[in-house]
Swiss-Prot record:
It is found in: Cytoplasm. This is Interferon-induced protein 44. Residues 1-152 form the TLDc domain. InterPro entries: P-loop_NTPase, TLDc_dom. Hepatocytes. The gene is IFI44. This protein aggregates to form microtubular structures. The lineage of its organism: Eukaryota, Metazoa, Chordata, Craniata, Vertebrata. Its main location: cytoplasm.
Length: 444
Protein backbone atom coordinates (compact mmCIF):
# COMPACT_ATOMS: atom_id res chain seq x y z
CA UNK A 1 0.00 0.00 0.00
CA UNK A 2 1.30 3.46 -0.90
CA UNK A 3 2.61 5.60 1.95
CA UNK A 4 0.74 8.91 2.14
CA UNK A 5 1.44 12.14 3.95
CA UNK A 6 -0.46 13.37 6.97
CA UNK A 7 -0.39 16.92 5.61
CA UNK A 8 -3.67 18.36 4.39
CA UNK A 9 -3.70 19.75 0.86
CA UNK A 10 -3.78 23.29 2.28
CA UNK A 11 -0.83 22.78 4.60
CA UNK A 12 1.17 21.07 1.86
CA UNK A 13 0.53 23.99 -0.52
CA UNK A 14 1.53 26.53 2.15
CA UNK A 15 4.82 24.71 2.69
CA UNK A 16 5.41 24.28 -1.04
CA UNK A 17 4.91 27.96 -1.74
CA UNK A 18 6.89 29.10 1.29
CA UNK A 19 9.94 27.10 0.28
CA UNK A 20 10.14 28.09 -3.37
CA UNK A 21 7.19 26.39 -5.06
CA UNK A 22 8.68 22.92 -4.71
CA UNK A 23 6.81 19.64 -5.08
CA UNK A 24 7.06 17.44 -1.99
CA UNK A 25 7.96 13.77 -2.51
CA UNK A 26 7.59 11.64 0.63
CA UNK A 27 10.78 9.75 1.54
CA UNK A 28 10.25 8.69 5.14
CA UNK A 29 7.37 8.37 7.59
CA UNK A 30 8.05 7.50 11.20
CA UNK A 31 4.82 5.58 11.78
CA UNK A 32 5.62 3.39 8.75
CA UNK A 33 9.41 3.13 8.60
CA UNK A 34 10.07 3.43 12.33
CA UNK A 35 11.24 6.19 14.66
CA UNK A 36 14.93 5.46 14.18
CA UNK A 37 16.92 8.51 13.16
CA UNK A 38 19.80 6.39 11.93
CA UNK A 39 17.50 4.58 9.49
CA UNK A 40 15.97 7.93 8.57
CA UNK A 41 19.34 9.36 7.58
CA UNK A 42 20.26 6.25 5.60
CA UNK A 43 17.08 6.75 3.59
CA UNK A 44 17.08 10.55 3.32
CA UNK A 45 20.72 11.60 2.86
CA UNK A 46 21.92 12.71 -0.58
CA UNK A 47 18.37 13.45 -1.78
CA UNK A 48 18.81 17.16 -2.49
CA UNK A 49 16.72 19.86 -0.75
CA UNK A 50 14.86 18.19 2.11
CA UNK A 51 11.89 19.12 4.30
CA UNK A 52 11.26 17.41 7.64
CA UNK A 53 7.75 17.79 9.08
CA UNK A 54 7.03 16.93 12.71
CA UNK A 55 3.51 16.42 14.05
CA UNK A 56 2.65 16.87 17.71
CA UNK A 57 -0.72 17.14 19.39
CA UNK A 58 -0.82 20.93 19.05
CA UNK A 59 1.86 21.81 16.50
CA UNK A 60 3.26 21.20 13.05
CA UNK A 61 6.92 22.16 13.06
CA UNK A 62 9.93 21.14 11.05
CA UNK A 63 13.22 21.85 9.37
CA UNK A 64 14.21 22.73 5.81
CA UNK A 65 17.67 21.89 4.48
CA UNK A 66 18.21 23.64 1.16
CA UNK A 67 21.40 21.71 0.42
CA UNK A 68 19.87 18.48 1.70
CA UNK A 69 21.35 16.05 4.22
CA UNK A 70 24.78 14.60 3.59
CA UNK A 71 26.59 12.39 6.05
CA UNK A 72 28.75 14.42 8.46
CA UNK A 73 28.47 17.55 6.31
CA UNK A 74 27.06 20.85 7.48
CA UNK A 75 23.88 22.21 5.92
CA UNK A 76 22.00 25.45 6.52
CA UNK A 77 18.83 24.63 8.47
CA UNK A 78 15.67 26.73 8.58
CA UNK A 79 13.12 25.85 11.26
CA UNK A 80 9.43 26.52 10.72
CA UNK A 81 6.16 26.36 12.62
CA UNK A 82 2.84 26.02 10.80
CA UNK A 83 -0.22 27.21 12.70
CA UNK A 84 -3.49 27.04 10.75
CA UNK A 85 -2.63 29.03 7.58
CA UNK A 86 0.30 31.03 8.97
CA UNK A 87 3.92 29.95 8.84
CA UNK A 88 6.83 31.35 10.81
CA UNK A 89 10.50 30.51 10.34
CA UNK A 90 13.82 30.83 12.12
CA UNK A 91 17.26 30.35 10.61
CA UNK A 92 18.91 27.85 12.89
CA UNK A 93 22.31 27.91 11.21
CA UNK A 94 24.72 25.19 10.05
CA UNK A 95 24.11 21.65 11.31
CA UNK A 96 25.16 18.17 10.33
CA UNK A 97 22.23 15.76 9.97
CA UNK A 98 23.71 13.63 12.78
CA UNK A 99 23.53 16.67 15.06
CA UNK A 100 20.03 17.66 14.02
CA UNK A 101 18.62 14.15 14.52
CA UNK A 102 20.52 13.31 17.75
CA UNK A 103 22.53 10.50 16.19
CA UNK A 104 25.65 9.60 18.19
CA UNK A 105 25.23 12.58 20.50
CA UNK A 106 28.41 12.00 22.47
CA UNK A 107 30.58 11.93 19.37
CA UNK A 108 29.07 14.92 17.60
CA UNK A 109 28.43 17.03 20.73
CA UNK A 110 24.89 18.02 19.84
CA UNK A 111 23.79 21.48 21.06
CA UNK A 112 20.52 21.82 22.94
CA UNK A 113 18.78 24.70 21.12
CA UNK A 114 17.07 22.24 18.74
CA UNK A 115 17.08 18.45 18.60
CA UNK A 116 14.84 15.86 16.93
CA UNK A 117 14.95 12.76 19.10
CA UNK A 118 13.15 10.02 17.20
CA UNK A 119 13.97 7.22 19.62
CA UNK A 120 12.30 9.05 22.54
CA UNK A 121 9.64 10.64 20.30
CA UNK A 122 10.32 14.25 21.29
CA UNK A 123 11.67 17.55 20.00
CA UNK A 124 13.79 19.62 22.36
CA UNK A 125 14.41 23.32 21.78
CA UNK A 126 15.44 26.24 23.94
CA UNK A 127 13.20 29.15 24.93
CA UNK A 128 14.73 31.52 22.38
CA UNK A 129 13.94 29.15 19.50
CA UNK A 130 10.41 28.67 20.82
CA UNK A 131 9.96 32.42 20.96
CA UNK A 132 11.32 32.97 17.46
CA UNK A 133 8.87 30.40 16.08
CA UNK A 134 5.94 31.89 17.99
CA UNK A 135 5.37 28.73 20.04
CA UNK A 136 4.24 28.35 23.63
CA UNK A 137 7.12 28.32 26.10
CA UNK A 138 7.40 24.57 26.52
CA UNK A 139 10.85 23.18 25.92
CA UNK A 140 9.75 19.67 24.95
CA UNK A 141 7.30 18.70 22.18
CA UNK A 142 6.10 15.12 21.89
CA UNK A 143 6.29 13.58 18.41
CA UNK A 144 3.16 11.82 17.16
CA UNK A 145 4.71 11.27 13.74
CA UNK A 146 7.31 12.77 11.46
CA UNK A 147 7.85 12.77 7.71
CA UNK A 148 10.78 13.67 5.48
CA UNK A 149 10.20 14.96 1.94
CA UNK A 150 12.48 15.49 -1.01
CA UNK A 151 11.79 18.97 -2.47
CA UNK A 152 11.60 18.74 -6.26
CA UNK A 153 10.98 21.30 -8.96
CA UNK A 154 7.24 21.35 -9.67
CA UNK A 155 8.02 21.52 -13.39
CA UNK A 156 10.98 19.28 -14.05
CA UNK A 157 12.44 18.60 -17.49
CA UNK A 158 10.39 15.42 -17.96
CA UNK A 159 7.10 17.17 -17.23
CA UNK A 160 7.92 20.16 -19.41
CA UNK A 161 8.79 17.82 -22.29
CA UNK A 162 5.45 16.03 -21.83
CA UNK A 163 3.56 19.32 -21.88
CA UNK A 164 5.33 20.44 -25.06
CA UNK A 165 4.53 17.13 -26.78
CA UNK A 166 0.86 17.39 -25.74
CA UNK A 167 0.74 20.96 -27.05
CA UNK A 168 2.06 19.81 -30.44
CA UNK A 169 -0.50 16.99 -30.55
CA UNK A 170 -3.39 19.33 -29.73
CA UNK A 171 -2.30 21.90 -32.31
CA UNK A 172 -2.12 19.20 -34.97
CA UNK A 173 -5.56 17.85 -34.05
CA UNK A 174 -7.18 21.29 -34.19
CA UNK A 175 -5.48 22.27 -37.44
CA UNK A 176 -6.66 19.12 -39.19
CA UNK A 177 -10.11 19.01 -37.58
CA UNK A 178 -13.06 18.62 -39.94
CA UNK A 179 -16.64 19.24 -38.76
CA UNK A 180 -18.90 16.19 -38.65
CA UNK A 181 -20.08 15.08 -42.06
CA UNK A 182 -18.42 18.11 -43.69
CA UNK A 183 -21.79 19.82 -43.19
CA UNK A 184 -20.06 23.16 -42.58
CA UNK A 185 -16.55 24.43 -43.18
CA UNK A 186 -16.24 26.25 -39.87
CA UNK A 187 -17.78 25.54 -36.47
CA UNK A 188 -19.36 28.54 -34.76
CA UNK A 189 -18.84 28.67 -31.00
CA UNK A 190 -20.77 31.28 -29.00
CA UNK A 191 -19.15 32.57 -25.82
CA UNK A 192 -21.74 33.52 -23.19
CA UNK A 193 -21.30 34.53 -19.59
CA UNK A 194 -21.41 37.29 -17.01
CA UNK A 195 -19.76 40.62 -17.72
CA UNK A 196 -16.01 40.43 -17.07
CA UNK A 197 -15.86 36.62 -16.98
CA UNK A 198 -13.13 36.43 -19.64
CA UNK A 199 -14.96 35.77 -22.93
CA UNK A 200 -12.92 38.21 -25.01
CA UNK A 201 -9.75 37.16 -23.18
CA UNK A 202 -10.39 33.56 -24.17
CA UNK A 203 -10.64 34.52 -27.84
CA UNK A 204 -7.41 36.52 -27.54
CA UNK A 205 -5.75 33.55 -25.86
CA UNK A 206 -6.81 31.10 -28.59
CA UNK A 207 -5.61 33.52 -31.26
CA UNK A 208 -2.31 34.00 -29.40
CA UNK A 209 -1.58 30.27 -29.43
CA UNK A 210 -2.09 29.99 -33.19
CA UNK A 211 -0.30 33.26 -33.98
CA UNK A 212 2.72 32.23 -31.93
CA UNK A 213 2.74 35.34 -29.75
CA UNK A 214 0.43 37.12 -27.32
CA UNK A 215 -2.24 39.16 -29.15
CA UNK A 216 -5.08 41.45 -28.08
CA UNK A 217 -7.39 41.76 -31.09
CA UNK A 218 -10.51 41.84 -28.90
CA UNK A 219 -10.55 44.63 -26.33
CA UNK A 220 -10.87 43.44 -22.75
CA UNK A 221 -11.65 45.28 -19.55
CA UNK A 222 -12.77 44.93 -15.98
CA UNK A 223 -15.45 47.58 -15.62
CA UNK A 224 -18.98 46.64 -14.61
CA UNK A 225 -20.42 47.14 -18.08
CA UNK A 226 -17.81 45.11 -19.92
CA UNK A 227 -16.08 45.98 -23.18
CA UNK A 228 -17.89 43.84 -25.78
CA UNK A 229 -20.98 45.78 -26.89
CA UNK A 230 -21.10 44.43 -30.43
CA UNK A 231 -21.68 40.94 -31.71
CA UNK A 232 -18.34 39.79 -33.12
CA UNK A 233 -17.54 36.67 -35.13
CA UNK A 234 -13.81 36.01 -35.11
CA UNK A 235 -12.12 33.75 -37.63
CA UNK A 236 -8.55 32.89 -36.70
CA UNK A 237 -5.64 32.34 -39.06
CA UNK A 238 -3.04 29.67 -38.43
CA UNK A 239 -0.03 31.96 -38.22
CA UNK A 240 0.23 35.42 -39.72
CA UNK A 241 -0.51 34.44 -43.33
CA UNK A 242 -1.90 30.96 -42.82
CA UNK A 243 -5.30 29.64 -43.76
CA UNK A 244 -8.34 30.17 -41.59
CA UNK A 245 -8.85 27.51 -38.94
CA UNK A 246 -12.04 25.38 -38.95
CA UNK A 247 -13.81 27.32 -36.20
CA UNK A 248 -15.21 30.79 -35.48
CA UNK A 249 -15.45 32.23 -31.98
CA UNK A 250 -18.49 34.46 -31.47
CA UNK A 251 -18.31 37.11 -28.75
CA UNK A 252 -21.32 38.89 -27.30
CA UNK A 253 -22.36 41.39 -24.68
CA UNK A 254 -22.04 39.90 -21.20
CA UNK A 255 -24.91 38.80 -19.01
CA UNK A 256 -25.89 41.19 -16.24
CA UNK A 257 -28.03 40.87 -13.14
CA UNK A 258 -29.35 44.36 -13.77
CA UNK A 259 -29.75 46.60 -16.82
CA UNK A 260 -26.91 46.88 -19.30
CA UNK A 261 -26.29 43.26 -20.18
CA UNK A 262 -27.26 41.12 -23.15
CA UNK A 263 -30.97 41.21 -23.95
CA UNK A 264 -32.26 37.68 -23.36
CA UNK A 265 -34.43 37.79 -26.48
CA UNK A 266 -31.33 38.31 -28.64
CA UNK A 267 -29.95 34.90 -27.68
CA UNK A 268 -32.37 32.93 -29.86
CA UNK A 269 -31.56 35.17 -32.83
CA UNK A 270 -27.83 34.58 -32.28
CA UNK A 271 -28.35 30.83 -32.05
CA UNK A 272 -30.36 30.75 -35.28
CA UNK A 273 -27.75 32.81 -37.15
CA UNK A 274 -30.01 35.85 -37.64
CA UNK A 275 -27.49 38.41 -36.38
CA UNK A 276 -24.66 39.73 -38.53
CA UNK A 277 -21.10 40.42 -37.38
CA UNK A 278 -20.63 43.83 -35.67
CA UNK A 279 -24.28 44.26 -34.74
CA UNK A 280 -24.53 46.85 -31.94
CA UNK A 281 -26.45 45.30 -29.05
CA UNK A 282 -29.23 47.20 -27.33
CA UNK A 283 -29.58 45.92 -23.75
CA UNK A 284 -33.15 47.23 -23.60
CA UNK A 285 -34.56 45.47 -26.66
CA UNK A 286 -33.71 42.72 -29.12
CA UNK A 287 -32.82 43.18 -32.78
CA UNK A 288 -35.64 44.29 -35.09
CA UNK A 289 -36.55 42.13 -38.08
CA UNK A 290 -36.05 45.11 -40.40
CA UNK A 291 -32.60 45.94 -39.00
CA UNK A 292 -29.82 46.01 -41.62
CA UNK A 293 -27.82 43.51 -39.50
CA UNK A 294 -30.69 41.01 -39.40
CA UNK A 295 -30.25 37.91 -41.59
CA UNK A 296 -33.62 36.70 -42.90
CA UNK A 297 -32.79 33.18 -44.00
CA UNK A 298 -29.62 31.95 -42.28
CA UNK A 299 -28.10 28.65 -43.35
CA UNK A 300 -26.52 26.02 -41.13
CA UNK A 301 -23.11 27.68 -41.46
CA UNK A 302 -24.55 30.86 -39.90
CA UNK A 303 -26.02 29.08 -36.89
CA UNK A 304 -24.32 28.49 -33.55
CA UNK A 305 -23.09 24.91 -33.26
CA UNK A 306 -21.85 25.03 -29.67
CA UNK A 307 -22.25 27.43 -26.74
CA UNK A 308 -19.51 27.87 -24.14
CA UNK A 309 -20.54 29.52 -20.89
CA UNK A 310 -17.58 31.42 -19.47
CA UNK A 311 -17.35 31.84 -15.69
CA UNK A 312 -14.75 33.56 -13.52
CA UNK A 313 -13.64 30.98 -10.93
CA UNK A 314 -13.34 33.67 -8.26
CA UNK A 315 -16.92 34.90 -8.69
CA UNK A 316 -18.93 31.63 -8.78
CA UNK A 317 -19.63 31.70 -5.05
CA UNK A 318 -20.96 35.27 -5.33
CA UNK A 319 -23.49 34.62 -8.10
CA UNK A 320 -26.82 36.18 -7.17
CA UNK A 321 -30.05 34.23 -7.42
CA UNK A 322 -30.97 36.43 -10.42
CA UNK A 323 -27.82 35.43 -12.31
CA UNK A 324 -28.34 31.75 -11.52
CA UNK A 325 -31.96 31.92 -12.72
CA UNK A 326 -30.84 33.68 -15.92
CA UNK A 327 -28.16 31.09 -16.73
CA UNK A 328 -30.52 28.20 -16.06
CA UNK A 329 -33.14 29.80 -18.30
CA UNK A 330 -30.61 30.08 -21.14
CA UNK A 331 -29.59 26.46 -20.64
CA UNK A 332 -33.23 25.37 -20.99
CA UNK A 333 -33.51 27.33 -24.23
CA UNK A 334 -30.36 25.67 -25.53
CA UNK A 335 -31.68 22.22 -24.68
CA UNK A 336 -34.97 22.99 -26.45
CA UNK A 337 -33.01 24.22 -29.49
CA UNK A 338 -30.81 21.11 -29.46
CA UNK A 339 -27.62 23.18 -29.06
CA UNK A 340 -24.88 21.44 -27.09
CA UNK A 341 -23.23 23.62 -24.45
CA UNK A 342 -20.22 23.42 -22.16
CA UNK A 343 -18.71 25.57 -19.41
CA UNK A 344 -15.35 27.30 -19.22
CA UNK A 345 -13.81 28.25 -15.87
CA UNK A 346 -11.32 31.14 -16.14
CA UNK A 347 -8.92 32.98 -13.80
CA UNK A 348 -7.96 29.80 -11.94
CA UNK A 349 -4.33 30.92 -11.82
CA UNK A 350 -5.33 33.87 -9.61
CA UNK A 351 -6.79 31.61 -6.91
CA UNK A 352 -4.94 31.40 -3.61
CA UNK A 353 -1.97 28.99 -3.48
CA UNK A 354 -2.31 27.89 -7.13
CA UNK A 355 1.13 27.54 -8.71
CA UNK A 356 2.24 26.96 -12.27
CA UNK A 357 2.91 23.34 -11.42
CA UNK A 358 -0.75 22.90 -10.47
CA UNK A 359 -1.86 23.91 -13.97
CA UNK A 360 -0.54 20.64 -15.41
CA UNK A 361 -3.15 18.61 -13.50
CA UNK A 362 -5.45 21.50 -12.72
CA UNK A 363 -8.68 19.52 -12.39
CA UNK A 364 -7.11 17.43 -9.60
CA UNK A 365 -6.19 20.57 -7.67
CA UNK A 366 -8.37 20.66 -4.54
CA UNK A 367 -9.60 24.30 -4.69
CA UNK A 368 -10.22 24.05 -8.43
CA UNK A 369 -12.09 20.79 -7.94
CA UNK A 370 -14.20 22.60 -5.36
CA UNK A 371 -15.04 25.30 -7.92
CA UNK A 372 -15.97 22.69 -10.52
CA UNK A 373 -18.31 21.03 -8.06
CA UNK A 374 -19.81 24.42 -7.21
CA UNK A 375 -20.59 25.05 -10.89
CA UNK A 376 -22.14 21.60 -11.06
CA UNK A 377 -24.21 22.16 -7.92
CA UNK A 378 -25.41 25.70 -8.64
CA UNK A 379 -25.85 25.62 -12.42
CA UNK A 380 -26.33 21.94 -13.26
CA UNK A 381 -23.35 21.36 -15.57
CA UNK A 382 -21.85 17.88 -15.60
CA UNK A 383 -18.25 17.86 -14.38
CA UNK A 384 -17.19 16.35 -17.71
CA UNK A 385 -18.61 19.42 -19.50
CA UNK A 386 -16.52 21.95 -17.56
CA UNK A 387 -13.07 22.97 -18.82
CA UNK A 388 -10.50 24.99 -16.90
CA UNK A 389 -8.29 27.60 -18.56
CA UNK A 390 -5.77 30.26 -17.71
CA UNK A 391 -6.15 33.11 -20.21
CA UNK A 392 -3.33 35.36 -21.33
CA UNK A 393 -3.84 38.73 -19.65
CA UNK A 394 -0.59 40.33 -18.50
CA UNK A 395 1.95 37.96 -20.04
CA UNK A 396 4.34 38.92 -22.83
CA UNK A 397 5.37 35.39 -23.80
CA UNK A 398 3.44 32.20 -24.51
CA UNK A 399 3.47 29.43 -21.92
CA UNK A 400 3.08 25.80 -23.10
CA UNK A 401 1.22 24.88 -19.89
CA UNK A 402 -1.40 27.58 -20.50
CA UNK A 403 -1.55 26.65 -24.18
CA UNK A 404 -2.46 23.05 -23.32
CA UNK A 405 -5.38 24.20 -21.14
CA UNK A 406 -6.65 26.58 -23.84
CA UNK A 407 -6.33 24.05 -26.67
CA UNK A 408 -7.89 21.26 -24.61
CA UNK A 409 -10.92 23.45 -23.88
CA UNK A 410 -11.25 24.35 -27.55
CA UNK A 411 -11.05 20.70 -28.59
CA UNK A 412 -13.85 19.86 -26.14
CA UNK A 413 -16.01 22.58 -27.73
CA UNK A 414 -15.44 21.16 -31.20
CA UNK A 415 -16.41 17.70 -29.99
CA UNK A 416 -19.62 19.22 -28.59
CA UNK A 417 -20.29 20.90 -31.94
CA UNK A 418 -19.89 17.56 -33.70
CA UNK A 419 -22.54 16.15 -31.37
CA UNK A 420 -24.88 18.96 -32.45
CA UNK A 421 -24.28 18.33 -36.16
CA UNK A 422 -24.65 14.58 -35.79
CA UNK A 423 -27.97 15.06 -34.01
CA UNK A 424 -29.53 17.13 -36.79
CA UNK A 425 -32.69 15.59 -38.34
CA UNK A 426 -31.87 13.09 -41.08
CA UNK A 427 -33.91 14.98 -43.68
CA UNK A 428 -32.02 18.20 -42.95
CA UNK A 429 -28.65 16.46 -43.21
CA UNK A 430 -29.66 14.87 -46.51
CA UNK A 431 -30.68 18.20 -48.02
CA UNK A 432 -27.48 19.84 -46.82
CA UNK A 433 -25.30 17.13 -48.33
CA UNK A 434 -27.11 17.46 -51.63
CA UNK A 435 -26.46 21.21 -51.60
CA UNK A 436 -22.79 20.62 -50.80
CA UNK A 437 -22.42 18.14 -53.68
CA UNK A 438 -24.16 20.53 -56.09
CA UNK A 439 -21.91 23.41 -55.04
CA UNK A 440 -18.82 21.23 -55.46
CA UNK A 441 -19.97 20.29 -58.97
CA UNK A 442 -20.73 23.89 -59.85
CA UNK A 443 -24.50 23.35 -60.08
CA UNK A 444 -27.04 25.93 -59.09
Amino acid sequence: MAVTTRLTWLHEKILQNHFGGKRLSLLYKGSVHGFHNGVLLDRCCNQGPTLTVIYSEDHIIGAYAEEGYQERKYASIILFALQETKISEWKLGLYTPETLFCCDVAKYNSPTNFQIDGRNRKVIMDLKTMENLGLAQNCTISIQDYEVFRCEDSLDERKIKGVIELRKSLLSALRTYEPYGSLVQQIRILLLGPIGAGKSSFFNSVRSVFQGHVTHQALVGTNTTGISEKYRTYSIRDGKDGKYLPFILCDSLGLSEKEGGLCMDDISYILNGNIRDRYQFNPMESIKLNHHDYIDSPSLKDRIHCVAFVFDASSIEYFSSQMIVKIKRIRRELVNAGVVHVALLTHVDSMDLITKGDLIEIERCVPVRSKLEEVQRKLGFALSDISVVSNYSSEWELDPVKDVLILSALRRMLWAADDFLEDLPFEQIGNLREEIINCAQGKK
